[in-house]
Amino acid sequence: MAEAENNLQILLYSDDREVRQQVINSVGIKPAADLPKITWDETATATITRDKVHNNRYDLLILDGEATKISGISVAKTLHEEENDLPPILVLTARQQDEWLVGWAGAKSVERPLTPLKLQEAVAAALR
C-alpha cells in the first residue's frame, strides 16, 4: 500500500477507449528509469475530468485534443480558469497547427501519431 502512495498520479481524459488504452500501453507503468511508477486514472467526459481534478491531486493531466464533445484543449483552458494549482498538462493533438492553441490553453502538445517513444519522452519531461 505504501508503494502505491508514492506512485505518480496521472489523469487521462479521452472519450475514446482505444486512445486511452494506447496511451497507457505506450507509456506503461514507468515512463523513465529515474521516475516512480504511475497510477492511471481514466475519464471519458469533460465533466468527470473537471470534478476529479477539483477533488484529487494529480502529478500530470493528459487530455485528448480530439475528444468529440469537448476537446482536451477546451478542458485545459477551463481548468486553468477554475483551478489555482494545476499539474502540468499534455494535450494530444492531430495537427501541428494546434500547438499555439494548446499553448494558449496553458498546456503542451503531443502531436499524433502517438508512438510509445514520443509519449514516454513527453510524459517523463512533464513529470521532471
Where are these regions (language model features)?
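Conserved phosphotransfer microenvironments
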Residues: 59-80
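His-Asp phosphorelay/catalytic-motif detector in bacterial-type signaling
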Residues: 57-59, 83-88
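Acidic, metal-coordinating helix/loop segments flanking the phosphotransfer/catalytic sites
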Residues: 42-60
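Output/docking surface of receiver
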Residues: 15, 92-96, 104-124
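Short beta-strand elements of ligand-binding domains
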Residues: 64, 88-93
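Conserved acidic segment of CheY-like receiver
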Residues: 7-28, 61
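A generic structural motif
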Residues: 31-40
